[in-house]
Amino acid sequence: SGSTISGYSTAARHCRPGYLEQADGTAWVALYSQNMLEMAVELAAHQPAYEDLATNFAGQFLLIARAMNGIGPDGMCDEEDGFYYDVLRLPNGSATRLKVRSMVGLLPLCATTVVEKWQRERVPALTARTYERFRRMPELLESIHATGPGQFGVADRGILALVNESRLRRILSRMLDENEFLSPYGIRALSRYHAEHPYSFWAQGQEYRVNYLPAESDTGMFGGNSNWRGPIWMPVNALLIRALLQYYLYYGDNFKIECPTTSGNMMNLFEVAREIANRLTRIFLRDPTGRRPVFGGAEKFQSDPYWRDHLLFYEYFHGDNGAGIGASHQTGWTGLVAPLIEIFGHLDARTFLEGGREAAFQHG
C-alpha cells in the first residue's frame, strides 16, 4: 500500500478527521491510464471504436498529472527539494507535506511511456483531440513532460510522463546518490539520509519517527515482516529501470547525468538502467571472496557445496550489504532479476534506440 511504501506507520490514521494524498498511489493510477491507453491504441487497429476509449484514458492521465504536479505550497511536488511527497490534509484546510525521502518520491518516474510515430498515426482523431486540448488548456501541457509538435524526441517519438526534464534531473540526482538511494545492490526504498536525519511527525501529541532501517522492520506493522524504510525491493527497481529505458528512447544521448552522483562519470539513461540492473544482479553473484551477498551470514548456504549454488529469491534485501530478508520463496517478483540479466545481456543502447521497445525482446 502507499502508506507502507512511504515508510511511516499510517500516522494519518491518528489524525482523523483528515486524509492523506499519496504520491505513489497517484502515480500508480497515472501509469495504469498509460497502460490502458496503449492497449486501446493496439485494439483500435482492428476495431476503431476503441479510439474513443483511448481518448478517455489519455484524458484521465492528463487530469491526474495536473492534480499531481499542481504548483503551490501544499502540492505533492516540492519545487524547493525537487522531490515528491505525500500530503496530509486536515479539515481546517491546512496541509502538510510529509517530507520523507522514500520510494514515494521516485515512483512518479514510473508513469512514463514513449509514443511512437506509428502509434499517433494509428489514432489520428485522438492525436488531434489531444493537441487541441493542449491548445485550449495550456496548463495541462505545462503539468507534464513537454511533448507534441516541436517537442518530439529521437525518431519522432513523443512521451507521456508525469516528470519533466528539470524535475527528472533533480530526482535522479538523489536516486543515484550513494549516500541516499543508490546502494551497491540497487535502489533503496528509503534514503540513507534518514540514518543521520530521522523524519519526525507529531499527531495528536504523539511523535512518529522514520529512521533508515536497511534490514528488518522495528515495528509490528503488516505482520512485522515488511519494511520499506531502507531495504531493496526488486519490483519497484524493475519499474524504475523500465522508466529510465522509456526516457532513453525519447532522449537518446541528449540526456546524460552523473552516475553515481558527484562521481564525474556521465551516463545516458540506458547506461544508468543497466548499472542499476547490474547492481541488482550482484546480490546473487559470488564476490571476490566467493561469498554471495544474498546469503548474508548464513554459513550453511555460503559454504556448503550442497546449498551454495541453489539461489533463494528473498522478498527484499538489506539496503547496505544485499543480504536476503523476509520470505525466501518470493520468486514471483524477485525472479524479475532473470529478465533483467537477459535483456541487458543481449541488448545494446544503439539497437534499443533504433528498434524501440520491441528490440528488448528480440534476439539475433
Model feature map: region roles:
Residues 1-364:
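Acidic, mature catalytic/reactive cores of soluble proteins
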